[in-house]
Amino acid sequence: MAIERTISIIKPDAVGKNVIGKIYSRFEENGLKIVAAKMKQLTLKEAQEFYAVHKDRPFYAGLVEFMTGGPVMIQVLEGENAVLKNRELMGATNPTEAAEGTIRADFATSVSINAVHGSDSVENAALEIAYFFSQTEICPR
């Protein structure tokens, strides 16, 4: 199995519900190590750039507004098949379709207020990690 890194963002709704620790416990209990983390208030420019892949989609403006509406917790997760494992832990984008016990089933409100973001591929994970973290901020353990 491949050791990978992925990005996880705990979105403003989940930060506001004070469930960061509960989400971190799920990562750790499932073999993912947090090797970098920061709390950040995203600027409009940062949110627009980070989600630029969606700029032509109808939900883009609302997503950018939501992601700048409060602080987020951004972390780099490391472990075997980290990208897939994190996506399994997150659950479906729509919390009504998310499997019981997933982060979104337990903490998300709707398809647009859905608690967490996670990279969808190893390639995108590398780009997303580099967007928020320098190599010196990542501490393998």
Swiss-Prot record:
Main location: cytoplasm
GO cellular component: cytoplasm
Positions annotated as active site in the UniProt record: H117
Residue sites binding ATP per the record: K11, F59, R87, T93, R104, N114
Subcellular location: Cytoplasm
One Gene Ontology MF term: ATP binding
GO aspect biological process, one term: CTP biosynthetic process
Family matches, as InterPro entries: NDK-like_dom (IPR034907), NDK-like_dom_sf (IPR036850), Nucleoside_diP_kinase (IPR001564), Nucleoside_diP_kinase_AS (IPR023005)
Keyword flag Transmembrane helix: no
Keywords: ATP-binding, Cytoplasm, Kinase, Magnesium, Metal-binding, Nucleotide metabolism, Nucleotide-binding, Phosphoprotein, Transferase
Catalytic activity: a 2'-deoxyribonucleoside 5'-diphosphate + ATP = a 2'-deoxyribonucleoside 5'-triphosphate + ADP; a ribonucleoside 5'-diphosphate + ATP = a ribonucleoside 5'-triphosphate + ADP
Cofactor: Mg(2+)
Pfam families: NDK (PF00334)
EC number(s) recorded for this UniProt protein: 2.7.4.6
Subunit-level organization: Homotetramer.
UniProt similarity note: Belongs to the NDK family.
Biological function: Major role in the synthesis of nucleoside triphosphates other than ATP. The ATP gamma phosphate is transferred to the NDP beta phosphate via a ping-pong mechanism, using a phosphorylated active-site intermediate.
Name recorded for this polypeptide: Nucleoside diphosphate kinase
Organism encoding this protein: Neisseria gonorrhoeae (strain NCCP11945)
Protein encoded by which gene: ndk
